């Protein structure tokens, strides 16, 4: 417990930006960052769950890393591949649900790290097909912004699309490019449909009570 508290960042949950997004003006809670880079063993869901009673009364929120499964080995989750499969390097989906439920019984809310600016593919173009409830979800190449990876001279996504006969979105990136993964077109109806379902899944199925959005410089805040 002491090692974790020394290592993890303690953040007062009352910055001006948080107030602008709807935090009560009298909020006095404290948020704990429940991970650090490559803390796969130290902050596994099962370990955090055992420490939940120690947090009770001191922390109101715990910020967890992006918990969806990626397409590879150990990962912090910031190369997202699946929206609805949350068997990650930190534990299984069931272990995550159990952790969040234990937090709740100890008066602690879990904050999800939401990575929706970019998405990992299998190769250049292949996105996984997922089913949740009675609906099927899958990103398409037309959900990739027209100028994806434009900063990478000689191997832009657009040039590769021409070589492969692939159609991208006609819309350009609304913010900073994230190299090496496909930046998503947030004007796309398909992207919007998937993201909305994903956020509902995080709250209604997994039990998160709020979000921290990653790479917010990459897309328009109006979305």
Pin down the residues of each PLM region.
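Sec-dependent signal peptide recognition
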Residues: 2-10
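Hydrophobic h-region of N-terminal signal peptides that target proteins for export
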Residues: 10-19
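Substrate-binding/active-site clefts of carbohydrate-active enzymes
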Residues: 22-46, 50-51, 57-206, 222
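Short catalytic-loop micro-motif centered on adjacent basic/acidic residues
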Residues: 210-216
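Active-site environment of divalent metal-dependent phosphoester hydrolases
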Residues: 219
